[in-house]
């Protein structure tokens, strides 16, 4: 049985976790989201999010984006290599439906896997 949990070990939590990803990252970009990835020394992927107030004013909107990204990551974690990922939201993402955001994320996960394995 495959475990689809989202435990603490699957998250980037501290600034020290985020810094290496920002320093030299493999990007996957769309008009609404940017995913930055970097190989890690663990045997599983980890994710962190940067959802700026500048682009999504209300906490409800920022939390909706976080929930969607988290859920997608939970289901994709077994297809992803051992990488650290930072998801950055851009302006206009709050206007998209959940299905549109899911489609964008699907494409970006595939791009990241190609670029990190290739």
From Swiss-Prot:
It catalyses: Endonucleolytic cleavage of RNA, removing 5'-extranucleotides from tRNA precursor. One of its GO terms (molecular function) is 3'-tRNA processing endoribonuclease activity. SUPFAM superfamilies: Ribosomal protein S5 domain 2-like (SSF54211). GO terms for biological process: tRNA 5'-leader removal. The keyword Nuclease applies. It is an enzyme of class 3 (hydrolase). Keywords: Endonuclease, Hydrolase, Nuclease, RNA-binding, tRNA processing. InterPro entries: Ribosomal_Su5_D2-typ_SF, Ribsml_uS5_D2-typ_fold_subgr, RNase_P, RNase_P_CS. Its EC number is 3.1.26.5. PANTHER family: RIBONUCLEASE P PROTEIN COMPONENT. Belongs to the RnpA family. Consists of a catalytic RNA component (M1 or rnpB) and a protein subunit. HAMAP family: RNase_P (MF_00227). RNaseP catalyzes the removal of the 5'-leader sequence from pre-tRNA to produce the mature 5'-terminus. It can also cleave other RNA substrates such as 4.5S RNA. The protein component plays an auxiliary but essential role in vivo by binding to the 5'-leader sequence and broadening the substrate specificity of the ribozyme. This is Ribonuclease P protein component.
């Amino acid at each position: 049985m495959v475990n689809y949990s989202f435990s603490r070990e699957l998250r980037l939590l501290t600034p020290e976790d985020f810094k290496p990803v920002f320093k030299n990252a493999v990007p996957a970009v769309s008009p609404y989201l940017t995913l930055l990835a970097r190989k890690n020394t663990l045997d599983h992927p980890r994710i962190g999010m940067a959802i700026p107030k500048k682009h999504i004013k209300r906490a409800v909107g920022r939390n909706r984006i976080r929930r969607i990204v988290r859920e997608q990551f939970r289901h994709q974690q077994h297809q992803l290599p051992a990488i650290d990922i930072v998801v950055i939201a851009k302006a206009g993402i709050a206007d998209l439906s959940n299905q549109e955001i899911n489609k964008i994320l699907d494409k970006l996960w595939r791009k990241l896997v190609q670029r990190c394995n290739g």
